[in-house]
Amino acid sequence: MEKTDKMKYICSYCNTYVYDEEKGDPETKLDPDTSLKEIPDSWLCPVCGMPKDYLKPVSNEIFDIRAKSYTETQHQAKDINYYRSIARNMLHGICGEYEVCNGKPERMCSGQKFGRSIGFGGAGQGKTFEENYNSLQQYKLKMRVIKDHKEPEMSLTIFNKQIALPVMGSSISGVRNSMNNSIPEETFYRGLLQGAMSSGTVGLVGNTNDVPDDLGVKTVGENHGWGIPIFKPQSQERLLELIRLAEELNVLAAGVDLEGAGSTFWKTANKPVYRKGEKDLVELVDSTELPIIFKGIMCREDAATVLDVGAAACYVSNHGGRVLDGAEGIASVLPEISKEIDGKIPVLADGAVRTGYDVLKILALGADVALIGRPLARMSLAGGEVPVKLYYRYVKNDLRNAMLLTGCDNLNEVTMDILVGPSQG
């Protein structure tokens, strides 16, 4: 009998694991000559944990290259750097996954794109992205170590739920437009949400123009409602429908990405987005019992309006520098916005937050919760829940050390007094 050619596969999620039907895989207990159809439905990729549906046929040439790489790293500890290397491969040409993600001009993602997708970079020349990093680094932490020892308390309550640390994942979307179309959008959302939930905190997801605009909120619903969908500023009618769906799915909260009015992706896809006036915001808040968050607040005047309309939280963000070039960095505007809010509602803020030390600075500048974007996006691309959880743990450990060494026993003690910077030095 003529021997049937055996197929070779690569996991399309992690782009790392390879499987040869002829040889099988002792690690996952697959005997030689086990075909793809014969692999049990319960089988999971040993690298990223995804099911067999992600195994895709690959040529012998590509298989040999990937097999060598996989063999070399098969027994390597699966730490953050391991997943960073996977992300670097998946984002080839648009993100170098550098040790410091700062938007500097020499970075792969930076610079004018002249109509091409901005990938992981910023709008225009990327100056706002860069300024987010620079403005935060202008502040230094004041070390204070003579104090009775106490383990820092990092938990807090927000939207009537307790979370283990004052860190969340910022609202991210757009795998096809910005991330080399490397994995399905829903899989990306799931990694962000599940990684946050298993870390004792909350993930946010956005919506994007090239998949159904309710995919994010539905994925949150599938995650037992543990997550927050943030919608682009679409028509008022559509936003009311999406918020109604969020309420039916019993999500923690919902929000509108007001700075998304400048989204080039939605504009080029012929899907209009709009600026929203005060009456629009009131209508959205009054339409639901859900806590409503307004994102994209970058000035004191808008913060006052967010308070006036009855929002549940004020989210300070310039979309990671991806909508308006030449704008102020988050750390430059956060103190005055926090002063305007005056503790009446929670203040959320993102903007070049990479470590627990950055988190402490953002909290000291007036935020109740710091949000992380690009690093968590890369972790979700590289392996879903597992690396996302690893990154949260890394940030939490740094935050613990930062609080310990600045004399902060709890979050109430995190104030501008622990900073030295433009207005303190």
Predicted ranges, named:
Residues 5-7, 41-42:
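Short metal-coordination and nucleic-acid-contact micro-motifs, chiefly zinc-binding Cys/His arrays
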Residues 10, 18, 44:
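The −1 position to Zn-ligating cysteines in a subset of zinc-ribbon hairpins
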Residues 13, 46-47:
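Short, cysteine/histidine-rich loop/knuckle motifs that typically chelate Zn2+
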Residues 20-21, 54-57:
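Short, non-ligating residues that shape and space the ligands of small metal-coordination modules
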Residues 27-42:
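Short linker/helix segments within small regulatory modules
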Residues 65-163, 423-425:
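An N-cap/entry alpha-helix motif that binds or orients negatively charged groups
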Residues 117, 126-214:
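N-terminal functional module of multi-domain proteins
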Residues 194, 222, 234-349, 356-374, ...:
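Alpha/beta enzyme core
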